[in-house]
């Protein structure tokens, strides 16, 4: 839009059309939408300069604009292909006439929803529209992840690129600096907006659509308001709180998921439970499908751009392209099924991969999420929370260690006296290291009372 606006300010005539998901079967709809306003703005003199056969052809898909104009006396051809070529030539002639006096930019958005007839006309215009005096630039946008493998747009693009008439351009995420600059200009604020800028950078990862939609949601919630051209709000508090996940973002992600095959969707749900980053072997082990089926599912996920290969900070095989994608897919899974998959992930991790330092917190997480399925799973969660806490304490991350121990004490089964003792004892040691004598004393008292309630066998165990 900025590109088109800049050209328009420089005198370029901008024609704008858009494809719509539920109107994709309407012939030539986006091109009709683009040409309609320019036709309506033509003077009688300008219309008079158009050949009557061109007026007749244009009236086929924009009848209201040219109603009452003289028609060509030529009889329609009995050959459908010839009629179509004559129609295409009429549209081409009109665009050529517009570009004779001025530069023309034709923008067609969301071509992944374009009907095949639209692409055929667009292909003709690109190859046959003469622009002797001023250039005609056609810009089309589409979402690659929304294209089926055999979508006609793919062949259309290859054909034009093959003859040097199309130049693909991929829009990359905004850089941190670009996001900051955008927010400074939009907000009319300077240093006050810095906390929100940093948070939105992390939350959106430079995705322009996510950025704009979250900002719109903050305004709709009156969390941010506008006064005298500048944003108003407690930006520190907003940046510390939970940002909204707008319905518009959910709908876009859900629509992308629903276009995939059922098998791929099933694998995708399991992957979302595994985490932002995941390994092929663990997906196979958890999903219980063979490697070939899993690879086919992953290929489809890659094609729809919901995941990337080997891009995560943990150097795992795959990573969701954006954490919002994983978040939305995770939320689409019913609670009971979600708990079941978490349990399957944890069991697979124990069975196929020996627990290591870097995995104990993941095992604790998965067993925590699955604990309501079976009380034994809560015991497993407490066991790995203890290990995760011990690892944190070993790395002098004492605050994290206490958090793990606290969580473990809330889920350890009442019957597991030894487990409770181990968690209390470990926490007491950390409190000692922190110099938190009151908390340490409380744990020592709790340990003494726990030992008094134990049987001889339980005392021997601890």
Question: Model-found features: residue ranges?
Answer:
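Conserved P-loop NTPase "ATPase switch" module shared by AAA+ and STAND
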Residues: 98-118
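Short secondary-structure boundary elements
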Residues: 173-403, 408-415
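A short beta-strand-to-loop transition that corresponds to the Sensor-1 phosphate-sensing loop
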Residues: 20, 140-145, 214-216
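Conserved Walker-type P-loop NTP-binding/catalytic site
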Residues: 10, 29-105, 155-165, 177-184, ...
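Sensor-1/coupling segment of RecA-like P-loop NTPase cores
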Residues: 121-170
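Tandem amphipathic alpha-helical repeat scaffolds
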Residues: 142, 328, 365-370, 387-391, ...
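Internal alpha-solenoid helical repeat scaffolds
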Residues: 8, 406, 410, 414-462
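P-loop NTPase Walker A phosphate-binding motif
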Residues: 1-25, 29
């Amino acid at each position: 839009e900025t590109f088109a606006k800049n050209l328009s300010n420089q005198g370029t005539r901008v024609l704008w059309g858009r494809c719509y998901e539920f109107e994709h079967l309407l012939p030539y709809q986006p091109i009709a939408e683009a040409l309609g306003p320019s036709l309506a703005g033509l003077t009688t003199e300008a219309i008079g300069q158009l050949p009557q056969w061109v007026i007749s052809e244009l009236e086929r898909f924009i009848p209201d604009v040219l109603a009452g104009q003289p028609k060509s006396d030529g009889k329609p051809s009995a050959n459908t292909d010839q009629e179509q070529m004559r129609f295409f030539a009429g549209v081409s002639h009109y665009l050529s006439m517009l570009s004779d006096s001025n530069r023309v930019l034709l923008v067609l958005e969301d071509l992944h929803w374009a009907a095949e007839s639209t692409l055929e006309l667009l292909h003709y215009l690109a190859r046959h529209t003469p622009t002797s005096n001023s250039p005609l630039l056609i810009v089309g946008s589409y979402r690659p992840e929304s294209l089926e493998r055999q979508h006609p747009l793919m062949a259309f693009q290859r054909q034009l690129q093959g003859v040097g008439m199309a130049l693909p351009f991929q829009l990359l995420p905004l850089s941190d600096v670009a996001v900051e600059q955008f927010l400074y200009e939009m907000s009319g604020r300077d240093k006050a907006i810095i906390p929100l800028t940093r948070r939105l950078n992390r939350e959106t990862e430079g995705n322009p659509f996510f950025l704009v939609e979250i900002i719109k949601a903050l305004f709709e919630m009156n969390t941010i308001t506008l006064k005298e051209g500048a944003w108003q709000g407690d930006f520190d508090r907003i940046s510390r709180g939970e940002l909204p996940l707008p319905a518009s973002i959910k709908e876009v992600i859900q629509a992308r998921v629903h276009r995939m095959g059922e098998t791929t969707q099933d694998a995708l749900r399991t992957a979302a439970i595994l985490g932002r980053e995941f390994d092929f072997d663990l997906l196979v082990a958890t999903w219980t499908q063979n490697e070939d089926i899993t690879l086919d599912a992953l290929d489809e996920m890659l094609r729809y751009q919901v995941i990337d290969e080997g891009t995560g900070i943990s150097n795992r095989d795959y990573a969701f392209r954006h954490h919002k994608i994983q978040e939305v897919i995770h939320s689409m899974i019913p609670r009971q099924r979600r708990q079941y998959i978490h349990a399957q992930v944890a069991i697979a991790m124990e069975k196929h991969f020996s627990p290591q330092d870097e995995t104990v917190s993941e095992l604790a997480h998965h067993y925590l999420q699955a604990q309501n399925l079976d009380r034994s799973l809560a015991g497993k969660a407490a066991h790995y929370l203890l290990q995760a806490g011990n690892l944190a304490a070993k790395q002098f991350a004492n605050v994290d260690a206490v958090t793990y121990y606290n969580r473990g004490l809330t889920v350890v089964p009442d019957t597991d006296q030894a487990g409770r003792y181990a968690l209390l004892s470990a926490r007491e040691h950390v409190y000692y290291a922190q110099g938190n004598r009151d908390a340490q004393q409380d744990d020592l008292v709790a340990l003494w009372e726990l030992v008094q309630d134990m049987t001889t066998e339980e005392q021997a165990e601890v």
